């Protein structure tokens, strides 16, 4: 069963699920913006309102958490596959970055913890969709709209397809 949480603004979708995820459900949290979005090694993730996808999903597992050490790559591949079905050709940079035309378009953050004697995985995904090129970031980046001006982009469809693809990948 899915538990869906939608927010106008959160500090971080990953932090939200780490605090509130139910170990007996698949949980999906989506925010229109994040005030403390982050990537690996606590790098700040720019999260302007209404422009991108900021999502996290969580699930429990009976497996040891160490078995999920490469799940960031599996999750990046899930994002890649969803975009590929829309004729958007991305590349994956190990271990957790998604690139489009040699510029970063997204990232994955995997966090694990134990609650109620169940191991939980939180998969955070940030994907630049409508971000404009006046946003300052410390590396080359792009968004789907900057690269594909004439493409019709439905963020909700992308979110649902990514969530399904990631959860199918864990099986």
Which residue stretches match the model-derived regions?
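Residue-level signal for inorganic ion chemistry
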Residues: 13, 55, 97, 126, ...
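Generic marker of residues within folded, mature protein domains
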Residues: 45-47, 98, 115
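N-terminal lobe of the biotin/lipoate ligase/transferase fold
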Residues: 1-85, 106, 152
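Active-site metal-binding loops of divalent metal-dependent hydrolases
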Residues: 32-34, 98, 127
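Long, positively charged amphipathic alpha-helical accessory segments at protein N-termini or as interdomain linkers
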Residues: 63-64, 73-90, 100-171
């Amino acid at each position: 069963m899915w538990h869906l949480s939608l927010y106008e603004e959160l500090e971080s979708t990953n932090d939200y699920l780490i605090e509130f995820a139910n170990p007996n459900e698949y949980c999906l949290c989506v925010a229109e913006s994040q005030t403390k979005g982050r990537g690996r090694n606590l790098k700040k993730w720019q999260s302007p309102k209404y422009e991108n996808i900021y999502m996290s999903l969580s699930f429990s597992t009976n497996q040891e958490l160490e078995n999920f050490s490469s799940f960031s790559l599996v999750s990046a591949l899930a994002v890649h596959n969803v975009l590929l079905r829309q004729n958007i050709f991305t590349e994956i940079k190990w271990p957790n970055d998604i690139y489009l035309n040699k510029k970063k378009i997204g990232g994955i953050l995997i966090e694990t913890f134990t609650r109620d004697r169940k191991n939980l995985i939180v998969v955070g995904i940030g994907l630049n969709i409508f971000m404009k090129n006046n946003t300052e970031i410390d590396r080359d980046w792009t968004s789907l709209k900057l690269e594909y001006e004439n493409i019709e982009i439905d963020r909700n469809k992308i979110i649902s397809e990514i969530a399904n693809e990631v959860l199918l990948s864990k099986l």
